[in-house]
């Protein structure tokens, strides 16, 4: 399918890639949370973030890869790129979340703010994007376009 004929061509290529990034990170967070909460048994990196599980990590990677594949189809790109871009984006999102946890621990804070009640603060809302955005950008510029 040509890019001009792609279902998401109506939003424009740049907006489509931004939407891919946002949905990929959200799908990682959601997949990791749901799988970790329901099936998580094997804890990892508990000294940084006590609730992280390997099962949650895998669930997040799978969710991200599926969403990235669907988005790539919508953008008129080869969905096989999702086999690389999905896990890379998921792991970058996890790294951003863990980096923010390290900063909070070093500061002796449970949350990074109170502006959004129940969500740990503004930094918790963007931590995954800080690491995932450069990964998606570099991948797309180097290999997709």
Where are these regions (language model features)?
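Interhelical loop and helix-boundary elements at the membrane-water interface
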Residues: 1-132
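C-terminal-most transmembrane helix of multi-pass membrane proteins
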Residues: 132-133, 145
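Juxtamembrane boundary at the C-terminal end of a transmembrane helix
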Residues: 138-145
């Amino acid at each position: 399918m040509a890019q001009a004929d792609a279902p998401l061509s109506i939003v424009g290529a740049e907006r489509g890639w931004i939407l891919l990034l946002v949905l990929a990170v959200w799908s990682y967070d959601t997949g990791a949370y749901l799988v970790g909460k329901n099936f998580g048994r094997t804890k990892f990196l508990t000294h940084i973030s006590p609730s992280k599980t390997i099962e949650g990590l895998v669930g997040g990677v799978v969710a991200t890869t599926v969403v990235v594949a669907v988005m790539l189809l919508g953008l008129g790109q080869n969905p096989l790129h999702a086999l690389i871009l999905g896990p890379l984006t998921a792991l970058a999102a996890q790294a951003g979340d863990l980096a923010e946890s390290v900063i909070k621990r070093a500061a002796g804070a449970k949350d990074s703010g109170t502006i959004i009640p129940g969500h740990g603060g503004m930094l918790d809302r963007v931590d995954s994007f800080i690491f995932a955005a450069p990964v998606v950008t570099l991948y797309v510029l180097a290999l997709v376009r």
